[in-house]
């Protein structure tokens, strides 16, 4: 049986059950060239080893493939695929879901501001009842996934999942930099103030088109192999306001040191590594690349 992303399947279940049919921001849906992606990849050298780091998008389209020959060769020569998490682990995904939901009689409305609840009601209408069991972070994710599914993006076509499935088929070793439990705990355990801010920001970004526009711009830069522009777009999105800065700190900056430490440890061994991590982790002053360079490793982009 063909493996799929267990976590994305669970998320798809929520999106489907909620019956979401968002049309917000679709006016921006720019004409996208249906061509294979170049992506962004870096070579990292230590005294003992060389690894290749490839920036991923967790949502993608079939038209993104095949990847460039340089990326394919980096994958093929690797003994080990390194990813953020193994999203095909159905048991791990099932175990994480309680961290994202409220047990009755508790509900979402009790944990977010009146304004955020009213904005959610205005956006999803009668489907808002189905949100009551979800924590704000999963509600925000479901809303965003719904919008991008309408634009043709699919978690089952995501770059990390693409290589995970191939690595399993090719019998390569697979190493996680994090775990689903860690990621779920990180998002599911946000205090009410931060979780409310995340959901409120998502609702605003969906309504005004910023989420679609900024993500589409980042994907276009990634497809063109333009790491510099990708970093600029992400930096702009991250510094729009205090809420954006806080969110990016939680999602990227706070996680990068731990992932960097594990990458450095693996580079001190002799395994050939192909590392696939969300492209956002390779951008900015607190990026994984920046931290690797500060530890004396040689980093260069493969163009």
Predicted regions and their residues:
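Boundary at the C-terminal end of the N-terminal hydrophobic targeting segment
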Residues: 27-31
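Short secondary-structure boundary/capping elements
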Residues: 36, 63-66, 254-258
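N-terminal low-complexity, Pro/Thr/Ser-rich intrinsically disordered segments
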Residues: 32-40
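N-terminal secretory signal peptides that target proteins for export/translocation
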Residues: 1-9
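Structured, acidic catalytic/metal-binding patches in enzyme active sites
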Residues: 40-250
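Bacterial N-terminal signal peptides
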Residues: 11-25
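A cross-kingdom marker for long, charged
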Residues: 245-303
């Amino acid at each position: 049986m063909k493996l799929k992303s267990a976590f994305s399947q669970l998320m798809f279940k929520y999106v489907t059950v909620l019956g979401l049919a968002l049309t917000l921001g679709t006016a921006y849906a720019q004409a996208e060239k249906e061509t294979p992606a170049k992506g962004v990849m870096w070579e990292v050298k230590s005294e003992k080893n060389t690894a290749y780091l490839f920036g991923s998008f967790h949502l993608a389209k079939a038209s993104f493939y095949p990847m460039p020959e340089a990326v394919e060769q980096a994958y093929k020569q690797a003994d080990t695929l390194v990813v953020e998490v193994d999203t095909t682990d159905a048991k791990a995904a099932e175990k994480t879901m309680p961290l994202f939901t409220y047990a009755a009689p508790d509900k979402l409305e009790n944990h977010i501001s009146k304004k955020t609840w009213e904005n959610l009601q205005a956006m999803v209408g009668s489907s808002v009842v189905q949100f009551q069991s979800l924590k704000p972070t999963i509600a925000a994710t479901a809303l965003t996934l719904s919008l991008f599914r309408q634009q043709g993006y699919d978690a089952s076509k995501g770059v990390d999942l693409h290589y995970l499935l191939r690595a399993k088929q090719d019998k390569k070793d697979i190493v996680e930099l994090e775990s689903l439990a860690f990621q779920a705990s990180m998002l599911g355990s946000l205090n009410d103030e931060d979780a409310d801010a995340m959901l409120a920001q998502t609702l605003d970004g969906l309504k005004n088109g910023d989420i679609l526009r900024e993500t589409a711009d980042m994907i276009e830069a990634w497809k063109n192999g333009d790491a510099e522009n990708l970093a600029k777009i992400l930096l702009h999105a991250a510094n729009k306001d205090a809420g954006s800065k806080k969110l990016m700190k939680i999602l990227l900056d706070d996680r990068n040191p731990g992932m960097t430490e594990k990458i450095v440890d693996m580079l001190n061994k002799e395994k050939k590594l192909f590392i696939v991590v969300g492209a956002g982790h390779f951008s900015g002053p607190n990026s994984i690349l920046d931290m690797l360079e500060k530890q004396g490793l040689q980093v260069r982009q493969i163009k």
